[in-house]
Amino acid sequence: MTYLADCQGPCSAFSGSTGDVWVKIHQAGYDPDRAAADGGTPWASKRLPEQNSTWTVALPATLRHGQYVLRHEILGLQRTNTDGNLAQFYPACHQIAVTGTGTAALPAGIALPGAYRPDDTTSVSFFFLLLFFSFLSCFIIIL
């Protein structure tokens, strides 16, 4: 998942820990079409090492120029629900400067920290629900 926050000036004076400033601009997860199309892995986390541990994200073309913090986050589900463990989040933040002629401001986003709770199983439940419906749709197509 990739989030973007507008620093509203120099990022040295910005605190991303208050307010709903983080806007999700990209996400990648389970993609069954990728496996069917080229025999590759459907999991984004498995594709990452195949891409030399790099990930490309396109910024919105209409985004106004300015200073931003880009937060890329890997969500680890490998130990979820084992021994009471929940999903693992691995964030990394980068200060970036956007140049160009765009004039669009970011919409309201979410608060980080605050959007996730240690006892929140929503991401895990949604993950299994997604797998269930993916399986169900495949099952219906086969019939």
Outline where the language-model segments fall:
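Peripheral, solvent-exposed domain-edge segments
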Residues: 1-54, 77-143
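Short acidic/polar micro-motifs centered on Gly/Asp/Asn
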Residues: 58-59, 76
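A glycine-anchored, Pro-Gly-centered beta-turn/N-cap motif
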Residues: 59, 64-66
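A short tyrosine-centered beta-strand micro-motif
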Residues: 68-72
